């Protein structure tokens, strides 16, 4: 089985359907004997340019190890699902399990806000 990185963008009005979509896609990969190495829901993000007059989309990243049949099935599912605005499936040489730069940046920002809030409370006293 080969390793793949899959990113798909969902219509922002369909964001509540994303967990169900992820569940369907991961279950089809696991049923075929594949593995999910990394799954990240990046949430709703600003697009670089409008797609179908939309300025935001819900992003999901998956790194998987799966047979080609499952990847073909996912491509077909993405193509005929109107909620999926764009998708990309890239074959990789190795399994990628570490957090993506998007998640790392988000985690680095969280402690800063906590420190800033503590400094603000100290200033009031």
Curated annotation (Swiss-Prot):
Pfam families: Ribosomal_S6 (PF01250). It comes from the Bacteria. SUPFAM superfamilies: Ribosomal protein S6. Residues 100-125 are annotated as: Disordered. GO terms for cellular component: cytosolic small ribosomal subunit. Residues 116-125 have a biased composition (Acidic residues). Keywords: Ribonucleoprotein, Ribosomal protein, RNA-binding, rRNA-binding. GO terms for molecular function: small ribosomal subunit rRNA binding; structural constituent of ribosome. InterPro entries: Ribosomal_bS6, Ribosomal_bS6_CS, Ribosomal_bS6_sf, Ribosomal_S6_plastid/chlpt, Transl_elong_EF1B/ribsomal_bS6. One of its GO terms (biological process) is translation. Residues 104-113 have a biased composition (Basic and acidic residues). Belongs to the bacterial ribosomal protein bS6 family. Binds together with bS18 to 16S ribosomal RNA. NCBIfam families: S6. This is Small ribosomal subunit protein bS6. It comes from Histophilus somni (strain 129Pt). The gene is rpsF.
């Amino acid at each position: 089985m080969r390793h793949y990185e899959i990113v798909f963008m969902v219509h922002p009005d369909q964001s509540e359907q994303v967990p169900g979509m992820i569940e369907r896609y991961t279950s089809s990969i696991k049923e075929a004997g594949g593995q999910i190495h990394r799954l990240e829901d990046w949430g709703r993000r600003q697009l670089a340019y409008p797609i179908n007059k939309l300025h935001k989309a819900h992003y999901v990243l998956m790194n998987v190890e799966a047979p080609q049949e499952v990847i073909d099935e996912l491509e077909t599912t993405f193509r005929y699902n109107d909620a999926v605005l764009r998708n990309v499936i890239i074959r990789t040489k190795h399994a990628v399990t570490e957090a993506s730069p998007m998640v790392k940046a988000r985690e680095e920002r969280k402690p800063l806000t906590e420190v800033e809030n503590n400094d603000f409370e100290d200033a009031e006293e």
